[in-house]
């Protein structure tokens, strides 16, 4: 049985194909940091940076205590009528459908239960129907004024709804009652 087994001690040699000869060896290990050129300047000289010629004036952030935050643009002061009309024009230019909502509290609240529900202030009451086909920002502003007269102690917000994507794209407070 041993005589029938033949063991070859000759080494086999295969010739490398052209595709194998141009292959790059895989990366193994980390290279030393001393091999990389130094890119940092040794001193902390800031004179090469551009300057506007004056001190930097930073805008103060909204206070975190005693002032409620609302929705988009809530960190800004209350909008004047001209700014409100410009926001509505942007909404209409974007081909969104304006919709007005109002709520007496304006915040999320829970009275009878700790878990979230329908009556916890997340859902506001719609003022009339969405303004399908509206192309005039002044018409939307008139609706805000009409809602103010009807509900002077309620928050009023304007929503821009995209009926193609079926999503609400913008929402901002148009009116806050006195004291907020």
Curated annotation (Swiss-Prot):
Annotated CDD domains: RuBisCO_small
Protein's GO biological process: photorespiration; reductive pentose-phosphate cycle
GO molecular function per UniProt: ribulose-bisphosphate carboxylase activity
Keywords: Calvin cycle, Carbon dioxide fixation, Chloroplast, Photorespiration, Photosynthesis, Plastid, Transit peptide
One Gene Ontology cellular component: chloroplast
Source domain of life: Eukaryota
Cellular location(s): Plastid, Chloroplast
InterPro entries for the chain: RuBisCO_ssu (IPR024681), RuBisCO_ssu_dom (IPR000894), RuBisCO_ssu_N (IPR024680), RuBisCO_ssu_sf (IPR036385)
Record bears the keyword Metal-binding: no
SMART domains: RuBisCO_small
Record: transit peptide: 1-57
Function: RuBisCO catalyzes two reactions: the carboxylation of D-ribulose 1,5-bisphosphate, the primary event in carbon dioxide fixation, as well as the oxidative fragmentation of the pentose substrate. Both reactions occur simultaneously and in competition at the same active site. Although the small subunit is not catalytic it is essential for maximal activity.
HAMAP family listed in its UniProt record: RuBisCO_S_bact
Subunit and partners: Heterohexadecamer of 8 large and 8 small subunits.
UniProt family annotation: Belongs to the RuBisCO small chain family.
Further remark: The basic functional RuBisCO is composed of a large chain homodimer in a 'head-to-tail' conformation. In form I RuBisCO this homodimer is arranged in a barrel-like tetramer with the small subunits forming a tetrameric 'cap' on each end of the 'barrel'.
Protein name per UniProt: Ribulose bisphosphate carboxylase small subunit, chloroplastic
Organism: Musa acuminata (Banana)
């Amino acid at each position: 049985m041993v005589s029938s087994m033949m063991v070859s001690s000759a080494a086999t040699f295969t010739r490398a194909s052209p595709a194998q000869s141009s292959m790059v060896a895989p990366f193994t290990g980390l290279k030393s940091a001393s091999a990389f050129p130094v890119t940092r300047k040794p001193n902390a000289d800031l004179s090469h940076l551009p300057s506007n010629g004056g001190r930097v004036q930073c805008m103060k952030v909204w206070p975190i205590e005693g002032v409620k935050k609302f929705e988009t643009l809530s960190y800004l002061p209350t909008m004047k009528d001209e700014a409100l009309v410009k926001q509505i024009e942007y909404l209409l230019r974007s081909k969104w459908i304006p919709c007005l909502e109002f709520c007496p509290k304006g915040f999320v609240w829970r009275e009878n239960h700790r878990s979230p529900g329908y009556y916890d202030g997340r859902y506001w009451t719609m003022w009339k129907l969405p303004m399908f086909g509206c192309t005039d920002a002044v018409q939307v502003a008139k609706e805000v004024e009409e809602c103010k007269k009807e509900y002077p102690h309620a928050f009023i917000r304007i929503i821009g709804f995209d009926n193609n994507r079926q999503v609400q794209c913008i929402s901002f407070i148009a009116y806050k009652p006195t004291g907020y």
